[in-house]
Structure formats: structure tokens, C-alpha cells
């Protein structure tokens, strides 16, 4: 069985020391899973969970009319098949979406005269079309109007309750003021805050504040209840002789001082002296001696506050009210009335302050009703309050599920923070919640509890695609709900059907707007596979409901300890968005509540297990977590007694038995892009950030070359990005060509009677969003066996199934004639000659023929006033032929537009009379090649209106596409048929026939009782094989019949699919209104590396090509090999990205081993010798076993692949050590310094010092000088100021600002300056005169008034100032 090099991960020598515990989760699952949860398509209708789209429908329906006589109820929804597949949507500029139908039930009630009784009059159920909903492609993207878009996940503040303080900044005294905020998922915000006088206030929806007790009273609590809820009370007893004692409550006494000696009544022993603290020991001693009461002085009781009303026992009148301070007079009155016990509040102003009691005192509102009306007045100032409306408003604020939604996450966080146990399906606030929020805030002020850190990932959650779309759907449905209610009330409901009520337009409009113009719906970055993957894994704090760049402070942008393993601390954009846009770490995933989780290995009793569990930031709190590289002995126990670990965001040394968790892998800390940088651990973080970002800008090159020094992540990214073609089932490759691969599926992959074949049509030279080229190339051969998940075709920037963003080049670090000053790069012409850095870019141009007021535009090759030479590449339909080489100004699509009728001169009239009407009334509006574009036409697509006649070119294109489809159909049928024949032969050959079978001519083909042979079967059509009957075995007859019927069914399906595709092909296209025909032309532009192009390594070492030197002038080594790039050594020390040097050394070793293998091949060394060398180089028992299975040609194929160098993998944070690199260099026969002697290519002299030379992976970035260089002589002008426009895209000019004017003035260049400011810029009349002067050969300048001066005058006049210009030489 042949194997494929492409799918063998062993070929990359791995330096990792830690064995893999779990595979990296699929990199784009964050998108796919979220959308799957939103749509729930695979779930049966009745088993759908109340989440996603289902939840939206259930929350808005049932919709009742105003009089409650009818209701519209939701039953279920279903999605149809999309009208166009992904490929067709790309080509036609359509949205990839499925039609949605919703089943609703209209119930009409008969309302009886008695209140509360009603009966059903009528029920109607109907499926209603509900617009289209965009579907996600297999790669986690959406196709909207023909372009691929990504919905970026949003990182926002989680709903719940948050406690904070102002750090003493609000009030001049510097006093710390605490506040609490309850944030729902949707609904009113509730804020509690203290002011500098310690009064507690509340705000609803950030309106005017009022005492918090108003809200609590509105909930139905009285002053007494509130006082006793928030304070504890002490009982005071009055003795006969006027002595006072209070009950000894251990909880309240701790931290207080004794006011008098405490004596044991039985023995007279002093247990605690006066003015000493009640310590734990003292309290225990008191309990042992049975002391229940302690003496207090009268001064202590005065100024205490009564916790209940104190009544006169004789008359029942109130002496002291609840919450009233006891004065000396009141105390005497209590004693006089003979009251023996009363209760006071415990307030010591140290651990318990009087702030809540003070709040009650300033609050003058007594009853619940008054409180409700007060709240109504605050929220609706100007409306006359009634008790009923106030109650409704208050209920709707926090307790109505339609208006207020905490969400499951909010409820979870509330329960977690406040320690309450409310069921998770209770999504509104409860009275107890509000009381507990206030209690926690008061305790916080009293010094208990902690404030929340809003940047903690336990307080921020991710809203992925599904949830963002769910919110949009809710907005749309709420708009629709209003319209339905109005319709119900306007018309007689019993005569209506559900579809008369529902208009899905508002919903479709909201969804369309979200996908088309939301800040989080972005044009996919498709430069290379890595940029696609990173874009889908991005987390943004911006967007609707998030932060704004201007408002976001430093803390939000900073790296937080909880980011570890969840959000990458390295990858974030430079510039204003730094820290606001982040990337998910490699192993991170998002749980159903939207919190980011990271995996850890479980440690039990000091032993590391292979059990892996995912933890969110909150769940991880308090656990001690060891790092992945902590040393472990062979039994899985930690080697050292004390291990460095993380605990609650701090690094601590912990005993090995205290550890509970351990990291899964060292790279779990960083994102995908950062994990592709070898020796990341030796780079400065700022440069690593640039390196991660620049890898995403690498242009796919003509010849992809996977890195010699990688990190092992290359294969993962290539597989998950979706740019490569991946085998769907196990099987054998049946046929391969450049555009398709046919795989015959293994029999064990489908059921006994099924037959199978997979056809993979490869993408050839398609255009990406960034105009780079997408092209797939097969990496398997006929006869190769592939497993499901294997890569069978490479995409852009992938090589043998691995990500390949750049090229491995031979680099020397040395100055060379000043050409690598300040990060310039000197390159060898060899790189240009070998097309190492050549890339193909594809531009799309579009011509549209419209139906104008003056007549129809026409696409044709018959264009007035153009010569044969100009039209030589157009066919008769007026479209350029494929393969034509075009330059700026060439015609791509010939088009003429009718002109308005003009007054004709006599000469023109004569010409018209002679030559007919045509020539004069049309003008040439052909599509021409814009400046700066030069290339080859590689494709043209034509879209015509349904019912319009097709031109010759369309016919040719359709025919070619039909032939391709037919070939697929025939191959599929052939392979299925061959497979079935093989199966039937196994069943039939050698068995005895039970009946004879004759041909149409009466000739016996199979005699009765004869053993069936292959020749007999070949002699008649397979369709008649079901007539064969086998003697003594009925099961065979059944199997034969079943196999044949399955075969026929499958052939029917294939034919049906083919016919459907052909039908679609022949159908006209849906074009925008007013468009008759649309032509798209694709031009491939070959971009070679040239001076001015930007290049970079993977370590943030970027530069611009300054000179391309002939190969013979480059410095060369002793064996005559010239280096390919010369970099400046001064670019390394100050930037501290030493990783590039280590990468060079390891790459040098890898290349040296490759050269050694090449020597073996050249001298036809014995196979055993090659094997021995490879085993020594890899030093890996698994690789040894693999090499032992290879013989002959297979071994030589492998050696030929490895002669470019043995690929190495140096994973992030566990890369190759210095010793490993030195041993590689020794193995390759190089000096362990990694330096060689170089000779000057021009003079042949030896350079004085040895130079560091090695292989580095270098990328060409998407900042190409061809896209930036631009020149203008005459072009468009701005409408108002008449100054030239700016920028390449608008064909603009260079701006001459005021500073440039000063410079010209300083030089005294008056006439040049006058020219700049008038005829070369915005003097309209002067521009025309200049043209005339040049045409007539006069070289005089007549400047006039610049248009900007007129603009200034008009602006002054618009201010009401009468400005006039004086003409002539008036004084």
C-alpha cells in the first residue's frame, strides 16, 4: 500500500519534551458551534432546547391583540434547502442563505359576559414564509452578496452584580465611596451608591438619585423590617438597683472592650479586666464560667438606637419609637415605667456603621404606595402619577420577563456573588436579590467582602455569532409584533389567516443590516490561511454594546492574569485598537454561558493524571496550578518538593501535595499566530506581537515552501483553515489531475449494500478577498491510500499539508555597502530569477450594461472611432479573450451607451444621410484596464437577464461547464458500477445456476445447473443479472437483487443531481433592477520581488528591499555558495528578538543535514547507509520503526524530499536547547559557533571576521510597492474647492500644504509658488487657459483667482459679512 509523504507528521524532527495530552480543539469551532447552537438544525423540532432562534420565537410569541380576543402562537420553524450553493453564490454575487418557514397557530376566543370566562371559537394553523436566514459555510464564514464575511465574537461585560469604589476621587476629602450596579442582559440598570455623608442612594437607569430606602419600601418592606434586616440587636436588662447588663453575645462582643471588670458571680474571680478586648480566649473562659450577662454603664446605653418600639406596659403608648436614639430623659422614663428589658441596635461605627439608619432618617416616605408614586415621578417627570400606573411601571422595571432579562449567565453570577439559591430559569430580579445586593454593599463599606475587577475574565464573556444574531432576531421580531397587534385590532380576526397578519420584512431587514453593516460583521481577511483562522478566532471589545476606542482606558487594554490560557497576551493590533482586539489562545474554548475556558490536567495527591478538565476563570480561582514544564518523574509525580505555580493570579511556590491542576501544554498560553513563531521564548514581547501580526500579511507565493524550522502547529493550521482539500472517508485514489481527485471509498466505510465514491473538485486560480490567488494542487498519486482527515490537495500557502507562508533562505548578518542601513534588506537576484518570492494577484473588473432613459446600453465589439489594433483581443460579443495580455488603457469589455439628442451641424447631417444613423448617437463607455494593472486575462463570466438571448461567448462557457459536470457524473456512475460488479461477481462466480438464462436470439447464456463464470456474466447486460437464481441458496438471490436496486437508486440520485445543476446553469441570472447584462473579467498579475517591497521574518524583524544584487556580487562561502539575503546585524541587539538567531542556527543545521543526504543520493549510497544516517539525525524510536518499513523507491522518494533540509519542530516554550542546536550543527558537519568565513563577491577578498550565516524563514508581506506607487498629471478635482483629490484609489495628486508654502516662500521661489497655488491646483479658468497656451505653443502664465478664495468669500458672506472684491488699481 502506497503512503503519502504529505500526511506523515514524523518527518518533522520534534524537540518537544512534553508528550501530547490532548489534541488542539478545531480552530474554527468557536464559530461553528455557536451557529449550530443558534439554529439547532440537527435537533428534531420537538426536542429543541429553549436557546438560540427557538428562544427568540418563544419569548416574543404568543402575540395577543389589545382586547385579548385573539392570540397568535408559535409552533415551530424549519429551514429549506438553499437556492444556490456556496460556489454559485461567490460567482453570482448572491447571499448563501436558506428560506425559513415558521408554523404559527391563530386562536380566536369567544369572550363571555362573565369576567374571566372565555371559550375557543376557532384555531387555524399555517406555515408562513419568514424570509431567508444566512447559513454558515463549512469554514465558519458567511457569503453575503458574493463576498466572504466573518462575524467577529464580542467580548463584553457579563450581566450580573458588580461592586466597585471610586478610589477616593469623587469627593475632595479623598473618602472612598462604594457603589453597586446590577446589569441585566436587557432592561433597566440599577445602581446603589454612597455619598460622602454615608447616605445610601439608588439610581434607576442612571436617572436622578433617591434614597435607597424608597426602592426597598416600594418592594413592600417597612422601616422596622429593614432596620432589623440590616442590623443585629443587643438586649439590655435593667436590675432592681438600677444596674444595667446586656446579654453576652460572643459574635457581637469580639473586638469590643469591656467597660467594667467582668467577675465570676460564684467565686468573685475577675475574668476580664476593664478596658481589655474580648479575645477568643476571654470569650471561651466566660462561657466556661457560665457568664450570660455582662455589666454596662448608663453612658453606654444613652445614644444607642432602639431596634423596636418600646411601649409603656400600663397604657400601651409608645415611649421610644423604632430607630429613635435613647436620650438621658427617655432612659429615665423607661426605668421609671418599670420596663425590665428592651433591645438596641448594635452599631459600633467601626465594624458596623450607622449609614443605613441615617438613610432611613432622611427618607420621609412612609408607605409602599408613596414610594411607588415617588419612583414614578422620578422616572416619568411631568406625567400625572396614579397608584395603578406607578405599580405597573415598577413591576415592568425589574419583575416582568418581557421587559427585564438577566439571562442564565446573569442569574448564575448573581447567585454566585450574593450566595443566594434562586433557580437558573428565574431571569428577573426578586425582592430578596435587591435586599442582598444592598446588604453586600453595606458589608463592603464595613470592611467585609471584595470589590469586583471588571477586567477579570469571570466578569467578561464572549458573544459569538449565534448570540449576536439572536439579539438581532429579537429586535426584528419585536418590531413585527407591534405591526401584528395593530393589524389584529384593525381587521376582523376571524376572517384572517396567519399569513395575513405576519409580514417578515422587518426581521429580514434587521438581519440583512446586521450582516451587511454591523461593526462586528467584517470582510474576511483572506490573505493567507493563517489570517483566515485568526480572523475567525478574534475577540473584539468594540462593537454595539461594547467599548469605544476613545473611552477605553489602560486597564481594559492591559493583560490580566486570567488571560492565561484563554486570551493571547501577545497577539493584538498595534495602534488605537491595542488590547481591545484580542485572539483566543490555542487550547481555549467557549462554554455555553459564553465564558472562555482552558484545559488543565488534574493532579491528585501529588500525582499528575491524564484526566483533562476545562475551567473558566471563576472556577479556576483558588486552585494551585503547576506549569506544563514542571519536572515529573516516571511515575507521574512532581520531582521537586516545591513547585512554582499560579494561584488566584499570583505566582507562588507550593508544596507538591497542594497542587490540584497542571497546564496541558506550554503553548496553551498563546494564540495560533504566536504559536507559529519558533523560539518565541527568546523574543521581546513587542517584537513577538509584530511577528504574529506580520505572518497574517504574508502573500501566498507561487511555490510554497514549508519552514525548515517550524513549531509543529503548521499542520494544524493548514488542516483547520479549510484551504486544503481534506479526505472525507478512507479510500484509494482512483484518478488525479490538476482540477479534481476521485477517491474510491473503502468497503468498511459504508454499509454492505452501499457503494461509494468521493469526487473532490479543486479550486483553480480563484480570487480571494485581498486579491491574492487561491489555487489547490493535489499531493496524492493514483493508488495512494488515504485516511479520513488526510490532506489530499494543498491550498494557497500550504506545502505537503503544512502551512508555508514564506521561503527558507540563506541569510548572512553583516553590513554591505550601506544597503542594509536602518532595516533595509539586500537580496540576491537569484531569488527573483528562481521565482522564489513571486506571487500571483487576481483583479476582478466588472462591466454592467443598463437600461438607461435614453435607451439600452450594449456590450459589443462594434465601438465607434476605434481601430482594429485596439479591438484585436475582443471576440464578436465584445469580451476580451482568455489569455490576452493587457496593459493600462486596454479595452476589456466593449460597451456603447446611447447619447442624448444634440443639435446637429449641417456637415453632421450630411454624414448621417450618407452613412446611416448609427455612428453619431452612441458613445464609447467600454471597461478599460486601470493604471498600474498589467497582466493576463484568466477568466470571464457573463450574467444575463432571465429570458434574454445569450451571446456566443456565454454559450461556450456554459458548454464547457456542462462537459465538466457530465464528466463527474459519468465517473461517479462508472466507479459505483465497477464496485457493484465486483461485489456481484464475488457472490455469483462459481455458484450453480438454478434456472437457465437465454439471450434475445434464444441462445443459452447460462445453462441450468452450470457453475457461473465471469465470461458468462460478461455475455449479457448487467441489468438482467437479477434474473440469475442460485441453486440451494436464496440469500444470494436477495443480496444480488438488493445490490442491483441500491445501484439503480444511486445512479438515479446522481443523474437527478446532475440534471438539477445543468438546469441551474441554463437558467438566467437574478440581476439588480435595470441591469441587462453583467460581465466580470479576471486578470492575473505576476508580481516578482522588487525594490520597495516589504519583507519580514517571523520575529518582528521587518524591512524593505533596498537593492537586488547580481548573484555573483553577493558574499559567498568557501564552497562557492553565495548567500541569498544580507541583513544588518544592528537590527538584533536593540530589539531583543534573539529568536531569529537561534532559528538561523537550527535552520543551518537542518540544511546541512539536507546537503549530506544530497551527497548520499549523488554517490548512489547503499540504502542501509541512508537509513542509518536518517536514524541518527532524527534520534526518535518511532521514526526508526517507520524507516524500517521503507524499501527501494519509497526510501529514495523520502530522501529526495529531505534533501532540501530535514524539517525541525521547535514548539513554543519547549524549543530546542542550545545543546540540541549544537549537536545538529555537529551532525551536519558545521562549526558549533554557527559562523562561517565569507568572501566578497566583487573583489574575492575574505571578510575580516567570521559571519553568522544560516537558514531563516522569510516572508513577503502584502505591502507591495506596485500597489503603492502612483503618478498623476491630470485627474479628478474636488467639487467645491476644485483642488485635486488625494489618494491612489481616487487617482489623486500630492497635497501642497501650508508648510510646503512656507518652504517655497523661504526660498523666494515666487513664480513656482504662484503656479502651484493657481493653475496646478484650483484656478479653474487658469487651467483652461494653460491648456490653450500649451496647444498654441505660447509659454506664458496667466494666473486667475484660486477657487478656494471664492469658497472663503462665500463662507464669510454666509456669516452675514458683506465682502466685495475691489477691481483694478484703486487705492
From Swiss-Prot:
It is an enzyme of class 2 (transferase). One of its GO terms (cellular component) is DNA-directed RNA polymerase complex. GO terms for molecular function: DNA binding; DNA-directed RNA polymerase activity; ribonucleoside binding. Pfam families: RNA_pol_Rpb2_1, RNA_pol_Rpb2_2, RNA_pol_Rpb2_3, RNA_pol_Rpb2_45, RNA_pol_Rpb2_6, RNA_pol_Rpb2_7. PROSITE patterns: RNA_POL_BETA. Keywords: DNA-directed RNA polymerase, Nucleotidyltransferase, Transcription, Transferase. It catalyses: RNA(n) + a ribonucleoside 5'-triphosphate = RNA(n+1) + diphosphate. It comes from the Bacteria. InterPro entries: DNA-dir_RNA_pol_bsu_ext_1_sf, DNA-dir_RNA_pol_bsu_external_1, DNA-dir_RNA_pol_su2, DNA-dir_RNAP_su2_dom, DNA-dir_RNAP_su2_hyb_sf, RNA_pol_bsu_bac, RNA_pol_bsu_CS, RNA_pol_bsu_protrusion. CDD domains: RNA_pol_B_RPB2. Its EC number is 2.7.7.6. One of its GO terms (biological process) is DNA-templated transcription. The keyword Transferase applies. Gene3D superfamilies: 2.40.50.100, 2.40.50.150, 3.90.1100.10, DNA-directed RNA polymerase, beta subunit, external 1 domain, DNA-directed RNA polymerase, subunit 2, domain 6, RNA polymerase alpha subunit dimerisation domain, RNA polymerase Rpb2, domain 2. DNA-dependent RNA polymerase catalyzes the transcription of DNA into RNA using the four ribonucleoside triphosphates as substrates. Belongs to the RNA polymerase beta chain family. The RNAP catalytic core consists of 2 alpha, 1 beta, 1 beta' and 1 omega subunit. When a sigma factor is associated with the core the holoenzyme is formed, which can initiate transcription. This is DNA-directed RNA polymerase subunit beta. The lineage of its organism: Bacteria, Pseudomonadati, Thermodesulfobacteriota, Desulfuromonadia, Geobacterales.
Amino acid at each position: 500500500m502506497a503512503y503519502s509523504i504529505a500526511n506523515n507528521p514524523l518527518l518533522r524532527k520534534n524537540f518537544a519534551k512534553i508528550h501530547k495530552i490532548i489534541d488542539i480543539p478545531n480552530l474554527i469551532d468557536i464559530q461553528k458551534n455557536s451557529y449550530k447552537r443558534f439554529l439547532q438544525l440537527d435537533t428534531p423540532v420537538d426536542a429543541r432546547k429553549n436557546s438560540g432562534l427557538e428562544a427568540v420565537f418563544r419569548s416574543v410569541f404568543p402575540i395577543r391583540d389589545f382586547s385579548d380576543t385573539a392570540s397568535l402562537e408559535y409552533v415551530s420553524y424549519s429551514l429549506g434547502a438553499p437556492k444556490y450553493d456556496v460556489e454559485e453564490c461567490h460567482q453570482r454575487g448572491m447571499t448563501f442563505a436558506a428560506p425559513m418557514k415558521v408554523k404559527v397557530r391563530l386562536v380566536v376566543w369567544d369572550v363571555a359576559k362573565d369576567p374571566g370566562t372565555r371559550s375557543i371559537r376557532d384555531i387555524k394553523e399555517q406555515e408562513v414564509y419568514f424570509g431567508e436566514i444566512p447559513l454558515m459555510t463549512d469554514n465558519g464564514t458567511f457569503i453575503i452578496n458574493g463576498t466572504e464575511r466573518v462575524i467577529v465574537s464580542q467580548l463584553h461585560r457579563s450581566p450580573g452584580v458588580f461592586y466597585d469604589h471610586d478610589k477616593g476621587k469623587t469627593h475632595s476629602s479623598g473618602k472612598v465611596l462604594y457603589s453597586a450596579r446590577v446589569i441585566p442582559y436587557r432592561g433597566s440598570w440599577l445602581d446603589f451608591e454612597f455619598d460622602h455623608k454615608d447616605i445610601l442612594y439608588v439610581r434607576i437607569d442612571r436617572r436622578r438619585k433617591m434614597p435607597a430606602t424608597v426602592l426597598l419600601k416600594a418592594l413592600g418592606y417597612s422601616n422596622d423590617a429593614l432596620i432589623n434586616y440590616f442590623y443585629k440587636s443587643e438586649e439590655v436588662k435593667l436590675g432592681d438597683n438600677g444596674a444595667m447588663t446586656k446579654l453576652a453575645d460572643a459574635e457581637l462582643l469580639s473586638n469590643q472592650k469591656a467597660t467594667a471588670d467582668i467577675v465570676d458571680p460564684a467565686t468573685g474571680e475577675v475574668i476580664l479586666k476593664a478596658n481589655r478586648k474580648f479575645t477568643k480566649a476571654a470569650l471561651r473562659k466566660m462561657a466556661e464560667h457560665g457568664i450570660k450577662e455582662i455589666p454596662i454603664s448608663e453612658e453606654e446605653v444613652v445614644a444607642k438606637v432602639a431596634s423596636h418600639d418600646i411601649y409603656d406596659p400600663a397604657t400601651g403608648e409608645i415611649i421610644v419609637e423604632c430607630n429613635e436614639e435613647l436620650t438621658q430623659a427617655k432612659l429615665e422614663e423607661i426605668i421609671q415605667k418599670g420596663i425590665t428589658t428592651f433591645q438596641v441596635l448594635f452599631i459600633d461605627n467601626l465594624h458596623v456603621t450607622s449609614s443605613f439608619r441615617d438613610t432611613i432618617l432622611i427618607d420621609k416616605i412612609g408607605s409602599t404606595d408613596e414610594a411607588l408614586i415617588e419612583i414614578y415621578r422620578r422616572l416619568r417627570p411631568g406625567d400625572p402619577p396614579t397608584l395603578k400606573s406607578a405599580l405597573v411601571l415598577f413591576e415592568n422595571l425589574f419583575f416582568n420577563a418581557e421587559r427585564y432579562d438577566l439571562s442564565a449567565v446573569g442569574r448564575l453570577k448573581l447567585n454566585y456573588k450574593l450566595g443566594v439559591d434562586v433557580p437558573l430559569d428565574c431571569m428577573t430580579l426578586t425582592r430578596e436579590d435587591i435586599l442582598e445586593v444592598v446588604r453586600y454593599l453595606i458589608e463592603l463599606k464595613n470592611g467585609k467582602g471584595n470589590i469586583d475587577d471588571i477586567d477579570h475574565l469571570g466578569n467578561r464573556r464572549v458573544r459569538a455569532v449565534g448570540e449576536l444574531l439572536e439579539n438581532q432576531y429579537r429586535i426584528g421580531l419585536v418590531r413585527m409584533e407591534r405591526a401584528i397587534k395593530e393589524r389584529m385590532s384593525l381587521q376582523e380576526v376571524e376572517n384572517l389567516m396567519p399569513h395575513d397578519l405576519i409580514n417578515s420584512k422587518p426581521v429580514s431587514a434587521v438581519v440583512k443590516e446586521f450582516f451587511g453593516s454591523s461593526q462586528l460583521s467584517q470582510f474576511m481577511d483572506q490573505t493567507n490561511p493563517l489570517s483566515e483562522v485568526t480572523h475567525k478566532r478574534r475577540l473584539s471589545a468594540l462593537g454595539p454594546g461594547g467599548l469605544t476606542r476613545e473611552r477605553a482606558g489602560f486597564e481594559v487594554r492591559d493583560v490580566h492574569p486570567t488571560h492565561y490560557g484563554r486570551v493571547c497576551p501577545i497577539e493584538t493590533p498595534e495602534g488605537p485598537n491595542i488590547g481591545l482586539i484580542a485572539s483566543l489562545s490555542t487550547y481555549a474554548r467557549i462554554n455555553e454561558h459564553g465564558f472562555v475556558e482552558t484545559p488543565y490536567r488534574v493532579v491528585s495527591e501529588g500525582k499528575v493524571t491524564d484526566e483533562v478538565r476545562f475551567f473558566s476563570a471563576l472556577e479556576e480561582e483558588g486552585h494551585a496550578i503547576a506549569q506544563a514544564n514542571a519536572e515529573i518523574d516516571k511515575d507521574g509525580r512532581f520531582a521537586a518538593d516545591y513547585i512554582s505555580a499560579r494561584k488566584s493570579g499570583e505566582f507562588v511556590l507550593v508544596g507538591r501535595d497542594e497542587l490540584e491542576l497542571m497546564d496541558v501544554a506550554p503553548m496553551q498560553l498563546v494564540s495560533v499566530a504566536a504559536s507559529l513563531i519558533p523560539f518565541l521564548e527568546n523574543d521581546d514581547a513587542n517584537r513577538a506581537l509584530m511577528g504574529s501580526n506580520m505572518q497574517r500579511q504574508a502573500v501566498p507565493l507561487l511555490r510554497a515552501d514549508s519552514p525548515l524550522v517550524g513549531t509543529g502547529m503548521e499542520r494544524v493550521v493548514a488542516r483547520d483553515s479549510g484551504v486544503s482539500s481534506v479526505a472525507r472517508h478512507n479510500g484509494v485514489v482512483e484518478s488525479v489531475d490538476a482540477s479534481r481527485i476521485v477517491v474510491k471509498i473503502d468497503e468498511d466505510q459504508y454499509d454492505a449494500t452501499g457503494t461509494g465514491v468521493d469526487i473532490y473538485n479543486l479550486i483553480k486560480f480563484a480570487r480571494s478577498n485581498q486579491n491574492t490567488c487561491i489555487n489547490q494542487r493535489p499531493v496524492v498519486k493514483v493508488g495512494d491510500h488515504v485516511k479520513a482527515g488526510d490532506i489530499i490537495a494543498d491550498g494557497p500557502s500550504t506545502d505537503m499539508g503544512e502551512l508555508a507562508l514564506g521561503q527558507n533562505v540563506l541569510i548572512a548578518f553583516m553590513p554591505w555597502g550601506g544597503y542594509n542601513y536602518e532595516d533595509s534588506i539586500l537580496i540576491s537576484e537569484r531569488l527573483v530569477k528562481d521565482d522564489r518570492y513571486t506571487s500571483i494577484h487576481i483583479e476582478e473588473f466588472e462591466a454592467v450594461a443598463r437600461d438607461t432613459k435614453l435607451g439600452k446600453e450594449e456590450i459589443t465589439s462594434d465601438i465607434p472611432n476605434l481601430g482594429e489594433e485596439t479591438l484585436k483581443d475582443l471576440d464578436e460579443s465584445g469580451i476580451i479573450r482568455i489569455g490576452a495580455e493587457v496593459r493600462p488603457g486596454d479595452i476589456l469589455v466593449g460597451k456603447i451607451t446611447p447619447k442624448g439628442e444634440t443639435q446637429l451641424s449641417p456637415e453632421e447631417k450630411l454624414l448621417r444621410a450618407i452613412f446611416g444613423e448609427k455612428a453619431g448617437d452612441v458613445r464609447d463607455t467600454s471597461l478599460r484596464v486601470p493604471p498600474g494593472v498589467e497582466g493576463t486575462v484568466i477568466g470571464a463570466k457573463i450574467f444575463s437577464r432571465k429570458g434574454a438571448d445569450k451571446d456566443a461567448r456565454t454559450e461556450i462557457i456554459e458548454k464547457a461547464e456542462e462537459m465538466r459536470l457530465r464528466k463527474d457524473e459519468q465517473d461517479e456512475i462508472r466507479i459505483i458500477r465497477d464496485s457493484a460488479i465486483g461485489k456481484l461477481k464475488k457472490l455469483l462466480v462459481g455458484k450453480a445456476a438454478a434456472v437457465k438464462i437465454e439471450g434475445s436470439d434464444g441462445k443459452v447464456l447460462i445453462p441450468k445447473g452450470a457453475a457461473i463464470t465471469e465470461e458468462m456474466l460478461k455475455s449479457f447486460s448487467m441489468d438482467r443479472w437479477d434474473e440469475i437464481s442460485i441453486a440451494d441458496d436464496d440469500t444470494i438471490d436477495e443480496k444480488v437483487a438488493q445490490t442491483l436496486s441500491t445501484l439503480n437508486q444511486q445512479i438515479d440520485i446522481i443523474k437527478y443531481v446532475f440534471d438539477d445543476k445543468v438546469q441551474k446553469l441554463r437558467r438566467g441570472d437574478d440581476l439588480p433592477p435595470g441591469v441587462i447584462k453583467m460581465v466580470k473579467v479576471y486578470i492575473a498579475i505576476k508580481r516578482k520581488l522588487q525594490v520597495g517591497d516589504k519583507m519580514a521574518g517571523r520575529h518582528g524583524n521587518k524591512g524593505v528591499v533596498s537593492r537586488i544584487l547580481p548573484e555573483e556580487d553577493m558574499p559567498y562561502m568557501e564552497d562557492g555558495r553565495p548567500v541569498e539575503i544580507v541583513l544588518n546585524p544592528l537590527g538584533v541587539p536593540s530589539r531583543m528578538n534573539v529568536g531569529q538567531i537561534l532559528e538561523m542556527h537550527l535552520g543551518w543545521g537542518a540544511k546541512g543535514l539536507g546537503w549530506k543526504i544530497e551527497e548520499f543520493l549523488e554517490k548512489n549510497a547503499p540504502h542501509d547507509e541512508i537509513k542509518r544516517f536518517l536514524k541518527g539525525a532524527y534520534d526518535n524510536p518511532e521514526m526508526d520503526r517507520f524507516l524500517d518499513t521503507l524499501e527501494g523507491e519509497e526510501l529514495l522518494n523520502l530522501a529526495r524530499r529531505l534533501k532540501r533540509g530535514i524539517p525541525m519542530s521547535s514548539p513554543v516554550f519547549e524549543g530546542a536547547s542550545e545543546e540540541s542546536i549544537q549537536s545538529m550543527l555537529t551532525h551536519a558537519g558545521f562549526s558549533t559557533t554557527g559562523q562561517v568565513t565569507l568572501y566578497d563577491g566583487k573583489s574575492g577578498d575574505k571578510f575580516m571576521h567570521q559571519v553568522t550565516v544560516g537558514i531563516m524563514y522569510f516572508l513577503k508581506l502584502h505591502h507591495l510597492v506596485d500597489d503603492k506607487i502612483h503618478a498623476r498629471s491630470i485627474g479628478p478635482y474636488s467639487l467645491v474647492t476644485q483642488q485635486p483629490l488625494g489618494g491612489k484609489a481616487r487617482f489623486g495628486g500630492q497635497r501642497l500644504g501650508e508648510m510646503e508654502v512656507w518652504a517655497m516662500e523661504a526660498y523666494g521661489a515666487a513664480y513656482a509658488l504662484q503656479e502651484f497655488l493657481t493653475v496646478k491646483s484650483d484656478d479653474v479658468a487658469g487651467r483652461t487657459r494653460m491648456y490653450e497656451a500649451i496647444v498654441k505653443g505660447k509659454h506664458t502664465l496667466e494666473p486667475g483667482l484660486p477657487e478656494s478664495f471664492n469658497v472663503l468669500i462665500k463662507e464669510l458672506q454666509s456669516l452675514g459679512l458683506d465682502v466685495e472684491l475691489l477691481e483694478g488699481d484703486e487705492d
